[in-house]
Amino acid sequence: MARFFRRRKFCRFTAEGVKEIDFKDLNTLKAYISETGKIVPSRITGTKARYQRQLATAIKRARYLALLPYTDSHGR
């Protein structure tokens, strides 16, 4: 039986020394949104709690300003 070794999760924001997550940085935010438009939980991404809260707030602000969609595109 083959053993499955999961790669170690790490917080990208801590490693890069990010102080604040910006809602205008769409490339970063898109990496933490699923195909259906949901915010991916920190237990999957490995993001620390402090940055996960900032991430959620930034994604919600970007959605409110129509920079990011709330859901995936309907009808496809």
UniProtKB/Swiss-Prot annotation:
GO process terms (BP): translation
Record InterPro entries: Ribosomal_bS18, Ribosomal_bS18_CS, Ribosomal_bS18_sf
Annotated TM spans: none
Molecular function (Gene Ontology), one example: structural constituent of ribosome
Keywords tagged on the record: Ribonucleoprotein, Ribosomal protein, RNA-binding, rRNA-binding
UniProt key word Oxidoreductase: no
Tagged with keyword Membrane: no
Gene Ontology cellular component terms for the protein in this record: cytosolic small ribosomal subunit
PANTHER family from the UniProt entry: 30S RIBOSOMAL PROTEIN S18, SMALL RIBOSOMAL SUBUNIT PROTEIN BS18M
Family: Belongs to the bacterial ribosomal protein bS18 family.
Assembly, per entry: Part of the 30S ribosomal subunit. Forms a tight heterodimer with protein bS6.
Function of the protein: Binds as a heterodimer with protein bS6 to the central domain of the 16S rRNA, where it helps stabilize the platform of the 30S subunit.
This protein's name: Small ribosomal subunit protein bS18
Gene source species: Azotobacter vinelandii (strain DJ / ATCC BAA-1303)
